[in-house]
Amino acid sequence: MKLAVIGGDGIGPEVTAEALKVLDAVLPGVDKTEYDLGARRYHATGELLPDSVIDELRAHDAILLGAIGDPSVPSGVLERGLLLRLRFELDHHINLRPGRLYPGVSSPLAGNPDIDFVVVREGTEGPYTGTGGAIRVGTPNEVATEVSQNTAFGVRRVVVDAFERARRRRKHLTLVHKTNVLTFAGKLWSRIVAEVGRDYPDVEVAYQHIDAATIFMVTDPGRFDVIVTDNLFGDIITDLSAAVCGGIGLAASGNIDGTRTNPSMFEPVHGSAPDIAGQGVADPTAAIMSVALLLAHLGEDAAATRVDRAVERYLATRGNERPATTEVGERIAAAL
């Protein structure tokens, strides 16, 4: 396996180091190449993501990312120039966010054993394509537009992926949208879900408006198995799912090219937390859980299961203790 590693900013390098410690314990011999991308490189060279680096990344089987973001860089520069460019250049059209409440984890819904779902979010369309603009800026008559792009091709490929995952899980899929207001995109999503669903007669299909889905995710999260949704709604509902499952610090994600033409990228969804960087207190659990997603994506199912079970054992016994960053990695690696 050839793995590209982007530690990034803030606590990113710290949590990534512990994730690699666990990866080495469960699957020794991975060929790793580290890339210096983020605020430090931007300040030193003015570069965000050179074309040459993109070409190098394409030669890897997967990418492990720590975190990107620094207050010394204007808002949006790193996000669009690095994170979103990676997503679009490598065609990461599937954003995968598992939501599971592990035993022993503190949550508003702690003790509910039925919280185990996955959100399949479209990753390269919607309002994040940068289409839109503004006129009469700074005047009382300013007009700003953000265009949400939804293509049949883009919707279909993420819907097919969601149905495949539902078939392997509990055979239930929920489309989350706002079809009563966003009628054009809503009809496209609804029609394609219905069309694809005919090829999966064993998968039960449901629909929820995004506002209703947020209510049910809190009051009855056990109803969800696989959720498929667009880029914007997925961005919102996955953070709610993280809160339901114990917080953003336990949220792993995968940015996936379903065609496997390009390497997929796996990362914890928490930010770079520059205020605690270098203190050794950042929780690397989400980064370690991202390694489990990475392994599963590359067909290393046994290794992925071992990591997931080691994390589960660690969380079940941790209680209110908050070990140092390196200690978390050492405990989980030792359990392997």
UniProtKB/Swiss-Prot annotation:
It is found in: Cytoplasm. One of its GO terms (biological process) is L-leucine biosynthetic process. Keywords: Amino-acid biosynthesis, Branched-chain amino acid biosynthesis, Cytoplasm, Leucine biosynthesis, Magnesium, Manganese, Metal-binding, NAD, Oxidoreductase. InterPro entries: ICDH/IPMDH, IsoCit/isopropylmalate_DH_CS, IsoPropMal-DH-like_dom, LeuB_actb. Mg(2+) binds at residues 211, 235, 239. NAD(+) binds at residues 271-283. Its main location: cytoplasm. Substrate binds at residues 87, 97, 121, 211. GO terms for cellular component: cytoplasm. It comes from the Bacteria. Binds 1 Mg(2+) or Mn(2+) ion per subunit. It catalyses: (2R,3S)-3-isopropylmalate + NAD(+) = 4-methyl-2-oxopentanoate + CO2 + NADH. Pathway: Amino-acid biosynthesis; L-leucine biosynthesis; L-leucine from 3-methyl-2-oxobutanoate: step 3/4. Its EC number is 1.1.1.85. GO terms for molecular function: 3-isopropylmalate dehydrogenase activity; magnesium ion binding; NAD binding. Its cofactor is Mg(2+); Mn(2+). SUPFAM superfamilies: Isocitrate/Isopropylmalate dehydrogenase-like. The record marks 128, 178 as: Important for catalysis. Catalyzes the oxidation of 3-carboxy-2-hydroxy-4-methylpentanoate (3-isopropylmalate) to 3-carboxy-4-methyl-2-oxopentanoate. The product decarboxylates to 4-methyl-2 oxopentanoate. Belongs to the isocitrate and isopropylmalate dehydrogenases family. LeuB type 2 subfamily. Homodimer. This is 3-isopropylmalate dehydrogenase. The gene is leuB.
